[in-house]
């Protein structure tokens, strides 16, 4: 290959007559091609290369790695890796496998509660636990590869990481290697499996959405119980110390009354052998008011909140489905009206699936874009927009001022009257000067016209003064 290159170089230098030109071989080749291109004729180097490619024994092999940017290649590989990892994590087969393993692990945990089965199949149960833990660890690592900071924006991912982290610590710290804790953490993963089933996921989302309202109702019930516990200790503390001895005992008694289970046994303690009817009637009124407000109203508020949120979610889903149906019907009507356009309906396009499923390109990785940088960028955009708005206002005001100034005729009429009174000669000069000023104002901008007018006015005033002195 080197011999072929030397032969090309000698042939090219013999055609161009640049044998004595200094520089490296690559520089001389580039200079010869540039000179030939400037002269408007094909380069001898180009013709030589074309001839060489015509001869198989003298073809030049180009290494693709020498002309490829390694950084771009690495970015492409990283982007493709992230894309495939995202598809793997979202693939139904992977989700089904993970859910199946978690259900099997939950069944083994239930079977290990039996000491006989635990001892008999200890190795099998331990192997299943280790396999499930390994797959959970791989899921966390794949989530980090897909996007480390995006991983922490999902609450379920945080829960999975905490569970896996604690389960891994038990191999290094014996104090936390407690079977009850490990089994409880593994059972919590079943909640995430329920999110894969849409009806169950809808109910879980409704419950999570109702937590703030339920917390407010709980605070109200606790405040109500605290008030009635003070009343109970004050009124019945000496008569029934078993249930109203202090605040703690009274709160426990009222909690039993809210559950509506056991309040009859509590009220039976008010019926003593002496039959104090005042205490019995007072206790009956006390429990009636508390159970009516606390149990019937307070507990039902929880049901109302959850039911209302579920109804709102169902309505939102129905509205979205209705909008999709309306959009499909509108598309069908437009297709019937426009017979000239061979459009394909969206329902037909969705039904006809060919090849693999494709996801829209979401853009390249933004590894260097942090939240602080994004906030600063948004602030800069807002500042630029505000500056443009102020610039537009100032520009409009300047345009109005320019229009008003241009409407002034430079006091031409006043100057003509003054000059006509002085002399007819000065009047002709004024007429000439005013015409010149009009022409200049049309050709020049406003500032140059004002300067020219001032000069003409000074010259005309000097002429008038000289004429006035000569007359005297």
From Swiss-Prot:
One example GO MF annotation = calcium-activated cation channel activity
Write out the similarity annotation.
Belongs to the cation channel sperm-associated (TC 1.A.1.19) family.
Q: In which tissues is it expressed?
A: Testis-specific.
**Which species is the source of this protein?**
Homo sapiens (Human)
Q: What Gene3D superfamilies would the database entry show?
A: 1.10.287.70, Voltage-gated potassium channels. Chain C
Pfam families assigned: Ion_trans (PF00520)
Protein's recorded name: Cation channel sperm-associated protein 4
Parts of the chain in the membrane but not crossing it: 247-258
Is Membrane tagged as a keyword? yes
Keyword Signal in record? no
């Amino acid at each position: 290959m080197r011999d072929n290159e030397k032969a090309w170089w000698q042939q090219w230098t013999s055609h161009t007559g640049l044998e004595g030109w200094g520089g490296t071989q690559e520089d001389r080749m580039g200079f010869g091609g540039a000179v030939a291109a400037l002269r408007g004729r094909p380069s001898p180097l180009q013709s030589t290369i074309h001839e060489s490619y015509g001869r198989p024994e003298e073809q030049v092999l180009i290494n693709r790695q020498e002309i490829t940017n390694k950084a771009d290649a690495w970015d492409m590989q990283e982007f493709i890796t992230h894309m495939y990892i995202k598809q793997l994590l979202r693939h139904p087969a992977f989700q089904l496998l993970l859910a199946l393993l978690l259900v099997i692990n939950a069944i083994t945990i239930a079977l290990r509660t039996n000491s006989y089965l635990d001892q008999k199949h200890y190795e099998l149960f331990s192997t299943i636990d280790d396999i499930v833990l390994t797959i959970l660890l791989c899921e966390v690592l794949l989530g980090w590869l897909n996007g480390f900071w995006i991983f922490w924006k999902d609450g379920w991912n945080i829960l999975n990481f905490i569970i896996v982290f604690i389960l891994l610590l038990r191999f290094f710290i014996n104090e936390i290697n407690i079977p009850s804790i490990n089994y409880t953490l593994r059972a919590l993963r079943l909640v995430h499996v329920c999110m894969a089933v849409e009806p169950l996921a809808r109910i879980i989302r409704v419950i999570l959405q109702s937590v703030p309202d339920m917390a407010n109702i709980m605070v109200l019930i606790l405040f109500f119980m605290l008030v009635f516990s003070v009343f109970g200790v004050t009124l019945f503390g000496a008569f029934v110390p078993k249930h109203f001895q202090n605040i703690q005992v009274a709160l426990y008694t009222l909690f039993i009354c809210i559950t509506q289970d056991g309040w009859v046994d509590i009220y039976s303690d008010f019926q003593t052998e002496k039959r104090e009817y005042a205490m019995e009637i007072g206790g009956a009124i006390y429990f009636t008011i508390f159970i009516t407000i606390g149990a019937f109203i307070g507990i039902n508020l929880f049901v109302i909140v959850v039911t209302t949120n579920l109804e709102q979610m169902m309505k939102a889903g129905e509205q979205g489905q209705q909008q999709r149906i309306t959009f499909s019907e509108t598309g069908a009507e437009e297709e019937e009206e426009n017979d000239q356009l061979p459009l394909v309906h969206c329902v037909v396009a969705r039904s006809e699936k060919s090849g693999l499923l494709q996801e829209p390109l979401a853009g390249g990785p933004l590894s260097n874009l942090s939240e602080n940088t994004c906030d600063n960028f948004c602030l800069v955009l807002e500042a630029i927009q505000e500056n443009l708005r102020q610039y537009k206002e100032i520009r409009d005001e300047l345009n109005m001022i320019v229009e008003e100034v241009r409407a002034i005729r430079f006091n031409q009429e006043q100057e003509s009257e003054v000059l006509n009174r002085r002399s007819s000669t000065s009047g002709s000069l004024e007429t000439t000067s005013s015409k010149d000023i009009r022409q200049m104002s049309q050709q020049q901008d406003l500032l140059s016209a004002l300067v020219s007018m001032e000069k003409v006015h000074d010259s005309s005033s000097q002429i008038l003064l000289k004429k006035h002195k000569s007359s005297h």
